[in-house]
Protein backbone atom coordinates (compact mmCIF):
# COMPACT_ATOMS: atom_id res chain seq x y z
CA UNK A 1 0.00 0.00 0.00
CA UNK A 2 2.81 2.39 1.03
CA UNK A 3 6.39 1.93 -0.08
CA UNK A 4 9.47 4.02 0.70
CA UNK A 5 12.57 3.41 -1.43
CA UNK A 6 15.92 4.92 -0.42
CA UNK A 7 14.17 8.04 0.90
CA UNK A 8 16.46 10.76 2.24
CA UNK A 9 16.16 14.34 3.43
CA UNK A 10 19.24 16.56 3.48
CA UNK A 11 18.96 20.17 4.64
CA UNK A 12 21.16 23.09 3.65
CA UNK A 13 24.58 22.70 5.14
CA UNK A 14 24.56 18.98 4.54
CA UNK A 15 22.66 17.88 7.64
CA UNK A 16 20.95 14.54 7.00
CA UNK A 17 17.59 14.36 8.74
CA UNK A 18 16.65 11.07 7.05
CA UNK A 19 19.14 8.73 5.41
CA UNK A 20 18.14 6.17 2.77
CA UNK A 21 15.04 4.69 4.40
CA UNK A 22 13.41 1.60 2.88
CA UNK A 23 10.04 0.47 4.21
CA UNK A 24 7.01 -1.48 2.97
CA UNK A 25 3.66 -0.96 4.71
CA UNK A 26 0.71 -3.23 3.93
CA UNK A 27 -2.89 -2.15 3.52
CA UNK A 28 -4.65 -1.91 6.88
CA UNK A 29 -1.39 -1.99 8.84
CA UNK A 30 -0.81 0.22 11.89
CA UNK A 31 2.80 1.43 11.90
CA UNK A 32 4.39 3.49 14.69
CA UNK A 33 7.51 5.59 14.08
CA UNK A 34 9.41 6.12 17.32
CA UNK A 35 12.83 7.31 18.41
CA UNK A 36 14.61 10.08 20.32
CA UNK A 37 14.19 13.75 19.40
CA UNK A 38 15.78 14.54 16.05
CA UNK A 39 15.75 10.93 14.84
CA UNK A 40 13.76 11.78 11.69
CA UNK A 41 10.41 10.22 12.57
CA UNK A 42 8.27 13.32 11.95
CA UNK A 43 10.32 14.31 8.90
CA UNK A 44 9.76 10.86 7.40
CA UNK A 45 6.02 11.07 8.00
CA UNK A 46 5.77 14.57 6.51
CA UNK A 47 7.54 13.43 3.36
CA UNK A 48 4.69 10.95 2.78
CA UNK A 49 2.22 13.80 2.16
CA UNK A 50 4.92 16.16 0.87
CA UNK A 51 4.66 18.71 3.64
CA UNK A 52 8.41 18.16 3.45
CA UNK A 53 9.86 17.33 0.03
CA UNK A 54 12.29 14.37 -0.09
CA UNK A 55 15.82 15.16 -1.25
CA UNK A 56 16.07 11.77 -2.94
CA UNK A 57 14.35 8.41 -3.15
CA UNK A 58 10.81 7.46 -4.10
CA UNK A 59 7.53 7.05 -2.21
CA UNK A 60 4.63 5.06 -3.64
CA UNK A 61 1.00 4.95 -2.48
CA UNK A 62 -0.96 2.14 -4.12
CA UNK A 63 1.77 1.89 -6.75
CA UNK A 64 1.71 5.59 -7.70
CA UNK A 65 4.78 7.78 -7.24
CA UNK A 66 3.70 10.70 -5.04
CA UNK A 67 6.25 13.00 -6.70
CA UNK A 68 4.24 12.73 -9.92
CA UNK A 69 1.06 13.94 -8.21
CA UNK A 70 -0.16 17.44 -7.37
CA UNK A 71 0.75 17.92 -3.67
CA UNK A 72 -2.57 19.57 -2.80
CA UNK A 73 -4.58 16.77 -4.41
CA UNK A 74 -2.30 14.24 -2.72
CA UNK A 75 -3.00 15.69 0.74
CA UNK A 76 -6.74 15.63 0.17
CA UNK A 77 -6.45 11.86 -0.27
CA UNK A 78 -4.48 11.37 2.96
CA UNK A 79 -5.91 11.89 6.45
CA UNK A 80 -3.75 13.97 8.81
CA UNK A 81 -4.04 14.36 12.58
CA UNK A 82 -1.75 16.51 14.74
CA UNK A 83 -1.30 17.02 18.48
CA UNK A 84 -2.64 20.59 18.32
CA UNK A 85 -5.84 19.20 16.72
CA UNK A 86 -6.30 22.30 14.55
CA UNK A 87 -10.09 22.58 14.66
CA UNK A 88 -11.38 25.87 13.28
CA UNK A 89 -13.01 27.73 16.21
CA UNK A 90 -15.51 29.62 14.02
CA UNK A 91 -16.83 26.43 12.42
CA UNK A 92 -19.33 23.97 13.89
CA UNK A 93 -18.31 20.38 14.54
CA UNK A 94 -20.12 19.28 11.39
CA UNK A 95 -18.30 21.91 9.33
CA UNK A 96 -14.94 20.89 10.81
CA UNK A 97 -15.53 17.21 10.07
CA UNK A 98 -16.78 17.99 6.55
CA UNK A 99 -13.88 20.23 5.56
CA UNK A 100 -12.16 17.90 3.09
CA UNK A 101 -15.40 16.42 1.68
CA UNK A 102 -16.47 20.01 0.95
CA UNK A 103 -13.20 20.68 -0.88
CA UNK A 104 -13.87 17.49 -2.84
CA UNK A 105 -17.31 18.92 -3.73
CA UNK A 106 -19.42 16.33 -1.93
CA UNK A 107 -23.14 17.29 -1.83
CA UNK A 108 -24.18 18.96 1.42
CA UNK A 109 -26.54 16.17 2.51
CA UNK A 110 -23.84 13.56 1.92
CA UNK A 111 -21.42 15.61 4.06
CA UNK A 112 -23.94 15.85 6.90
CA UNK A 113 -24.72 12.15 6.76
CA UNK A 114 -21.00 11.29 6.82
CA UNK A 115 -20.50 13.51 9.88
CA UNK A 116 -23.39 11.76 11.67
CA UNK A 117 -21.95 8.33 10.81
CA UNK A 118 -18.52 9.25 12.13
CA UNK A 119 -19.84 10.73 15.39
CA UNK A 120 -21.71 7.50 15.98
CA UNK A 121 -18.45 5.56 15.68
CA UNK A 122 -17.06 7.36 18.74
CA UNK A 123 -20.31 7.32 20.74
CA UNK A 124 -21.08 11.01 20.17
CA UNK A 125 -24.67 11.84 19.24
CA UNK A 126 -25.97 14.11 16.44
CA UNK A 127 -26.51 16.88 19.00
CA UNK A 128 -22.76 17.62 18.69
CA UNK A 129 -23.04 18.56 15.00
CA UNK A 130 -24.03 22.18 15.65
CA UNK A 131 -21.70 22.79 18.58
CA UNK A 132 -18.40 24.66 18.37
CA UNK A 133 -14.96 23.36 19.42
CA UNK A 134 -14.84 25.47 22.61
CA UNK A 135 -17.95 23.64 23.84
CA UNK A 136 -16.11 20.29 23.81
CA UNK A 137 -13.59 18.76 26.20
CA UNK A 138 -10.00 18.15 25.09
CA UNK A 139 -10.72 14.48 24.51
CA UNK A 140 -13.83 15.24 22.48
CA UNK A 141 -11.93 17.78 20.37
CA UNK A 142 -9.25 15.20 19.61
CA UNK A 143 -11.95 12.71 18.62
CA UNK A 144 -13.27 15.29 16.14
CA UNK A 145 -9.73 15.78 14.82
CA UNK A 146 -9.52 12.05 14.13
CA UNK A 147 -12.98 12.00 12.53
CA UNK A 148 -12.04 14.90 10.27
CA UNK A 149 -9.10 12.83 9.01
CA UNK A 150 -11.48 9.94 8.28
CA UNK A 151 -14.24 12.02 6.68
CA UNK A 152 -13.26 11.68 3.02
CA UNK A 153 -12.60 7.96 3.47
CA UNK A 154 -8.84 8.14 2.79
CA UNK A 155 -7.01 4.80 2.62
CA UNK A 156 -4.02 6.28 4.49
CA UNK A 157 -3.92 8.37 7.67
CA UNK A 158 -0.87 10.13 9.13
CA UNK A 159 -0.90 10.94 12.85
CA UNK A 160 1.73 13.10 14.56
CA UNK A 161 1.59 12.49 18.34
CA UNK A 162 -2.19 13.05 18.34
CA UNK A 163 -2.75 12.10 21.99
CA UNK A 164 0.39 13.66 23.47
CA UNK A 165 -1.28 16.71 25.07
CA UNK A 166 -4.10 14.80 26.80
CA UNK A 167 -4.31 13.72 30.42
CA UNK A 168 -3.41 10.04 31.09
CA UNK A 169 -6.99 8.78 31.58
CA UNK A 170 -8.34 10.49 28.43
CA UNK A 171 -5.24 9.42 26.51
CA UNK A 172 -5.68 5.77 27.52
CA UNK A 173 -9.36 5.83 26.62
CA UNK A 174 -8.71 7.38 23.20
CA UNK A 175 -5.96 4.87 22.43
CA UNK A 176 -8.35 1.98 23.10
CA UNK A 177 -11.09 3.68 21.08
CA UNK A 178 -8.87 4.49 18.12
CA UNK A 179 -7.35 1.02 17.88
CA UNK A 180 -10.86 -0.46 17.79
CA UNK A 181 -11.85 2.11 15.13
CA UNK A 182 -8.81 1.27 13.01
CA UNK A 183 -9.60 -2.44 13.09
CA UNK A 184 -13.21 -1.73 12.11
CA UNK A 185 -12.38 0.59 9.20
CA UNK A 186 -9.19 -1.23 8.08
CA UNK A 187 -7.26 2.00 7.47
CA UNK A 188 -3.50 2.14 6.97
CA UNK A 189 -2.01 4.26 9.76
CA UNK A 190 1.42 5.87 10.10
CA UNK A 191 1.63 7.10 13.68
CA UNK A 192 4.48 9.14 15.17
CA UNK A 193 5.02 8.94 18.93
CA UNK A 194 7.77 9.38 21.50
CA UNK A 195 5.97 7.06 23.95
CA UNK A 196 7.04 3.40 23.76
CA UNK A 197 4.04 2.27 25.82
CA UNK A 198 1.76 3.88 23.23
CA UNK A 199 3.63 2.25 20.34
CA UNK A 200 3.50 -1.20 21.97
CA UNK A 201 -0.20 -0.83 22.65
CA UNK A 202 -1.28 0.41 19.21
CA UNK A 203 1.13 -0.81 16.56
CA UNK A 204 1.09 -3.86 14.34
CA UNK A 205 4.74 -3.03 13.70
CA UNK A 206 7.10 -0.52 15.31
CA UNK A 207 9.80 1.34 13.36
CA UNK A 208 12.60 2.52 15.66
CA UNK A 209 14.76 5.31 14.24
CA UNK A 210 18.05 6.86 15.33
CA UNK A 211 19.94 9.67 13.58
CA UNK A 212 17.73 9.45 10.49
CA UNK A 213 18.11 5.70 10.00
CA UNK A 214 15.94 2.69 10.80
CA UNK A 215 17.49 0.66 13.61
CA UNK A 216 14.81 -2.01 13.92
CA UNK A 217 11.40 -2.88 12.47
CA UNK A 218 9.18 -5.51 14.05
CA UNK A 219 6.02 -6.35 15.91
CA UNK A 220 5.89 -5.23 19.55
CA UNK A 221 6.54 -8.84 20.59
CA UNK A 222 9.53 -9.21 18.28
CA UNK A 223 11.12 -5.99 19.49
CA UNK A 224 10.50 -6.72 23.17
CA UNK A 225 11.83 -10.27 22.90
CA UNK A 226 14.73 -9.56 20.54
CA UNK A 227 16.00 -5.96 20.71
CA UNK A 228 18.38 -5.36 17.80
CA UNK A 229 21.11 -3.73 19.86
CA UNK A 230 21.96 -1.90 23.08
CA UNK A 231 20.37 1.34 21.85
CA UNK A 232 17.02 -0.41 21.34
CA UNK A 233 17.28 -2.06 24.77
CA UNK A 234 17.94 1.28 26.45
CA UNK A 235 15.22 3.03 24.46
CA UNK A 236 12.64 0.38 25.34
CA UNK A 237 13.63 0.48 29.02
CA UNK A 238 14.35 -2.42 31.34
CA UNK A 239 10.89 -2.36 32.92
CA UNK A 240 9.27 -2.94 29.52
CA UNK A 241 11.46 -5.95 28.86
CA UNK A 242 9.65 -7.86 31.60
CA UNK A 243 8.06 -10.67 29.67
CA UNK A 244 5.07 -12.80 30.51
CA UNK A 245 5.33 -16.57 30.76
CA UNK A 246 5.83 -17.99 27.27
CA UNK A 247 2.75 -20.18 27.69
CA UNK A 248 0.52 -17.28 28.78
CA UNK A 249 0.35 -14.65 26.06
CA UNK A 250 -3.13 -13.18 26.29
CA UNK A 251 -5.33 -11.95 29.09
CA UNK A 252 -8.12 -14.48 28.52
CA UNK A 253 -5.68 -17.34 29.18
CA UNK A 254 -5.18 -16.44 32.82
CA UNK A 255 -8.10 -14.21 33.84
CA UNK A 256 -10.57 -15.20 36.55
CA UNK A 257 -13.72 -15.98 34.57
CA UNK A 258 -16.12 -15.57 37.51
CA UNK A 259 -15.69 -12.04 38.90
CA UNK A 260 -18.08 -10.99 41.64
CA UNK A 261 -20.77 -8.76 40.15
CA UNK A 262 -23.84 -6.83 41.24
CA UNK A 263 -26.64 -5.07 39.37
CA UNK A 264 -27.34 -1.36 39.79
CA UNK A 265 -30.80 -1.99 41.26
CA UNK A 266 -29.52 -3.94 44.26
CA UNK A 267 -29.65 -2.21 47.64
CA UNK A 268 -26.51 -1.09 49.40
CA UNK A 269 -27.26 -3.65 52.11
CA UNK A 270 -27.38 -6.43 49.53
CA UNK A 271 -24.09 -5.24 48.04
CA UNK A 272 -22.37 -5.24 51.43
CA UNK A 273 -23.74 -8.69 52.20
CA UNK A 274 -22.37 -9.98 48.88
CA UNK A 275 -18.95 -8.47 49.61
CA UNK A 276 -18.95 -10.19 52.99
CA UNK A 277 -19.92 -13.57 51.52
CA UNK A 278 -17.32 -13.41 48.74
CA UNK A 279 -14.60 -11.82 50.94
CA UNK A 280 -14.04 -8.89 48.57
CA UNK A 281 -14.10 -5.12 49.11
CA UNK A 282 -15.49 -4.13 45.70
CA UNK A 283 -17.98 -5.38 43.12
CA UNK A 284 -18.24 -4.94 39.36
CA UNK A 285 -21.57 -3.43 38.31
CA UNK A 286 -23.24 -5.03 35.26
CA UNK A 287 -26.62 -4.75 33.58
CA UNK A 288 -28.95 -7.62 32.63
CA UNK A 289 -26.97 -8.28 29.44
CA UNK A 290 -23.75 -8.51 31.51
CA UNK A 291 -22.45 -5.23 30.05
CA UNK A 292 -19.94 -3.66 32.43
CA UNK A 293 -21.22 -0.34 33.82
CA UNK A 294 -18.63 0.39 36.53
CA UNK A 295 -17.73 -0.63 40.06
CA UNK A 296 -18.73 -0.04 43.67
CA UNK A 297 -16.54 -0.51 46.73
CA UNK A 298 -17.06 -0.59 50.47
CA UNK A 299 -15.81 2.99 50.89
CA UNK A 300 -18.41 4.38 48.45
CA UNK A 301 -21.17 2.56 50.28
CA UNK A 302 -19.96 3.73 53.67
CA UNK A 303 -19.77 7.37 52.53
CA UNK A 304 -23.24 7.32 50.96
CA UNK A 305 -25.25 4.93 53.14
CA UNK A 306 -27.33 7.74 54.68
CA UNK A 307 -28.23 9.48 51.40
CA UNK A 308 -28.46 6.59 48.92
CA UNK A 309 -30.29 3.29 48.87
CA UNK A 310 -29.22 1.38 45.76
CA UNK A 311 -25.95 0.60 43.98
CA UNK A 312 -27.03 2.69 40.97
CA UNK A 313 -26.85 5.82 43.15
CA UNK A 314 -23.22 5.39 44.16
CA UNK A 315 -21.22 3.31 41.66
CA UNK A 316 -18.49 4.86 39.50
CA UNK A 317 -18.29 4.31 35.76
CA UNK A 318 -14.67 5.46 35.23
CA UNK A 319 -12.94 2.10 35.31
CA UNK A 320 -9.92 0.76 33.44
CA UNK A 321 -10.66 -2.26 31.25
CA UNK A 322 -8.78 -4.47 28.80
CA UNK A 323 -10.02 -6.54 25.89
CA UNK A 324 -9.89 -10.29 26.49
CA UNK A 325 -7.66 -10.70 23.43
CA UNK A 326 -5.15 -8.10 24.71
CA UNK A 327 -1.55 -9.08 25.28
CA UNK A 328 -0.90 -9.96 28.89
CA UNK A 329 2.12 -7.66 29.15
CA UNK A 330 -0.12 -4.63 28.51
CA UNK A 331 -2.29 -5.60 31.47
CA UNK A 332 0.77 -6.21 33.66
CA UNK A 333 2.04 -2.75 32.76
CA UNK A 334 -1.32 -1.08 33.35
CA UNK A 335 -1.80 -2.65 36.78
CA UNK A 336 1.75 -1.98 37.96
CA UNK A 337 2.07 1.50 36.46
CA UNK A 338 -1.34 2.79 37.56
CA UNK A 339 -1.20 1.14 40.99
CA UNK A 340 -4.66 -0.38 40.58
CA UNK A 341 -5.85 -3.58 42.26
CA UNK A 342 -7.54 -5.21 39.31
CA UNK A 343 -8.59 -4.77 35.70
CA UNK A 344 -11.93 -6.04 34.34
CA UNK A 345 -11.69 -7.95 31.06
CA UNK A 346 -14.36 -7.20 28.44
CA UNK A 347 -15.23 -8.15 24.88
CA UNK A 348 -15.74 -5.78 21.93
CA UNK A 349 -19.28 -4.92 23.11
CA UNK A 350 -18.08 -4.28 26.70
CA UNK A 351 -19.62 -7.49 28.06
CA UNK A 352 -17.76 -8.56 31.19
CA UNK A 353 -15.65 -11.65 30.48
CA UNK A 354 -13.43 -11.86 33.56
CA UNK A 355 -10.99 -10.05 35.81
CA UNK A 356 -7.21 -9.86 36.26
CA UNK A 357 -6.06 -8.98 39.77
CA UNK A 358 -2.79 -7.56 40.99
CA UNK A 359 -2.25 -10.65 43.14
CA UNK A 360 -2.68 -12.97 40.16
CA UNK A 361 0.23 -11.27 38.39
CA UNK A 362 2.78 -11.88 41.15
CA UNK A 363 3.83 -15.30 39.85
CA UNK A 364 4.05 -14.04 36.28
CA UNK A 365 6.25 -11.06 37.16
CA UNK A 366 8.36 -13.25 39.49
CA UNK A 367 8.98 -15.78 36.72
CA UNK A 368 9.75 -12.98 34.26
CA UNK A 369 12.40 -11.45 36.52
CA UNK A 370 13.89 -14.48 38.27
CA UNK A 371 12.99 -17.45 36.08
CA UNK A 372 16.13 -17.32 33.93
CA UNK A 373 18.42 -17.01 36.98
CA UNK A 374 16.80 -19.98 38.69
CA UNK A 375 17.08 -22.06 35.52
CA UNK A 376 20.76 -21.18 35.25
CA UNK A 377 21.39 -22.15 38.89
CA UNK A 378 19.67 -25.49 38.34
CA UNK A 379 22.01 -26.30 35.46
CA UNK A 380 25.19 -25.48 37.41
Swiss-Prot record:
Name of the protein described by the UniProt record: Glycine betaine/carnitine/choline transport ATP-binding protein OpuCA
Description of how the protein assembles with itself and partners: The complex is composed of two ATP-binding proteins (OpuCA), two transmembrane proteins (OpuCB and OpuCD) and a solute-binding protein (OpuCC).
Residue stretches making up the CBS domain: 255-314, 315-373
Induction comment from the UniProt entry of this chain: Repressed by OpcR.
Keywords: Amino-acid transport, ATP-binding, CBS domain, Nucleotide-binding, Repeat, Transport
Activity regulation remarks: Binds cyclic di-AMP (c-di-AMP), which may regulate the transporter activity.
Single GO BP term: glycine betaine transport
MF (Gene Ontology): ATP binding; ATP hydrolysis activity
Gene expressing this chain: opuCA
Database matches in Pfam families: ABC_tran, CBS
ABC transporter domain location: 2-236
Organism per entry: Bacillus subtilis (strain 168)
UniProt xrefs under InterPro entries: AAA+_ATPase, ABC_transporter-like_ATP-bd, ABC_transporter-like_CS, CBS_dom, CBS_dom_sf, Gly-betaine_transp_ATP-bd, P-loop_NTPase
Amino acid sequence: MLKLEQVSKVYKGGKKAVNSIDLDIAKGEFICFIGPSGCGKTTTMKMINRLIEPSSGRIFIDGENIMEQDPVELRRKIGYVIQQIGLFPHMTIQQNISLVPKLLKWPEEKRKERARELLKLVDMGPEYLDRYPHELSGGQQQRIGVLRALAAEPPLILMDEPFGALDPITRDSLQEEFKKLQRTLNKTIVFVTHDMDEAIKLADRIVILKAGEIVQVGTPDEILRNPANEFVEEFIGKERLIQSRPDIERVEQMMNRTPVTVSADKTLSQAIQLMREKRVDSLLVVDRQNVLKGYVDVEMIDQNRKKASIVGDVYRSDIYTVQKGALLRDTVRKILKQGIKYVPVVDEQNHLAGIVTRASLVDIVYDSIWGDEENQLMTI
